[in-house]
């Protein structure tokens, strides 16, 4: 009984020796184990999306290293509405169908094609794969005692040796796994009702026998549609153009959308397209706000246009594009990465995600069910419950409240899709930030065709309003922590009255670096009993206020003493300000980041997007280098005293052991 687990479910585990990859035969064997896992996952997701499996809310197969030379391979499904019998039936049926019919050649070809494309992309993009990825692969190679293969070697070996992997060889591998005696069933439950519905060991074995003797129908692979059709507007055009700075251009399209074009100084072959909408979940009423991120997640898992979720995965691999989205309070970001030698698929994808997004009914039902389960079990996850209480305490706004089960149930897949589409319903409220080394002429044709053809919706969304701030100080204590540690947080809110510009923000950041160091030295290193400490400043440009979060984990009996010490450290540092040496260190670190930023497509795109959201100016960041040189100790300390001397409100909270 795992109280902190969000879902109930049943799993079958096998334990078996790790394959030590040291020759071609072991390379093939390792690939076969990996493909069995992928084939199971692909089929399970397809059957959930198609509505064939409505009795479960999800599932997965995985291989996990459990010892230097041993692995665990498991197959798990998640129950819906605590129904453990349905979950057991679903898993037994999946396993028995594979026992009887194996996997089809079409399924195997699809997995091979997608994986080979990913490996080929890794070879093509080797120059951009950073040092962390290289060290991670080196560490993995060392840990698993396997030869270190370059992306090129891995791709060429896979391309040649995977031809020996057939549905017959995988069927033999599957039977080898199923005959493995080192196996056990596990049922995970997070509440008493699910525990009562759990099957007895005898019932599990009887069910396994029943399905082994059942004649089950073979799975029919639905195939892949790999075409994405986009209707272009022949009337679309660029209505104005403005140079904002060197290598930074602003275009306005005839549909009202704005496009910012930037070139990076590096050699990357990457093109980043980010749509920034000035609508986010705060544009929605309290009854919907907390479901908008869930709707966005459902869209991401449902495919776009004519492409199903699985087809989109394959299409994206073949066209070297990736897509992600994020909903925040006042904005929604939709990011697509493409290649400079083939930028068109990136534009096609972002157009279709905005104009022809879909939500699969079965995916929505699964996510909805998971959200309800998470709500029901919130009491069992004290850290999450504590964070939610602190969030509600800092605001006097219904939009901070969690929805109840009846409100979640009322929100249909059609409602979720309509809400998600509203985030990008008005082109005039979208700015597209495009970063990469592609000629402007080539980009202009793609921008006009794919971004200029986005139409204005019939139901545009009003801009959101910031959360209403609580006006009274408050304190929260939750005594539900399962671990013998205390989690403490203190939020201080400062009213800036005027928008915080980039120069002020840099002064505040320089001060916070020095403050964080003080807190670390005084609390964590000298006053033992604190395990971690952090200091974070954030600015809300719409609400025109500044928040400072002090957070630490410590021995439960010492949280009051350490808070007093932390506040003394903050008062002393505010009175003292920062020194010349500390400012120099800050300037050097920021300058290093700026140098890297100019060469990195992703970092430059993030900087422009942040500039747009924080300062409503896509070119604000271009002043950073000059402002950095102009910073003085006096200016920093004056700004800090002006903005951080008088908190308007203080909210404290502590999560203590039971």
Where are these regions (language model features)?
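Proteolytic maturation boundary segments
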Residues: 1-26, 30-31, 38-49, 109-113, ...
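M16 family metallopeptidases and their MPP-like homologs
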Residues: 6-26, 44-162, 183-189, 267-300, ...
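Long, His/Glu/Asp-enriched segments that create or flank divalent metal/ion-associated functional microenvironments
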Residues: 33-37, 520-524
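Active-site recognition of the HExxH zinc-binding catalytic motif
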Residues: 37-38, 289-297, 513, 517
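Peptidyl-prolyl cis-trans isomerase
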Residues: 165-169, 173, 358-359, 364, ...
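Conserved short beta-strand edge segments in small beta-sheet-based binding/regulatory domains
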Residues: 360-366, 457-461, 577-578
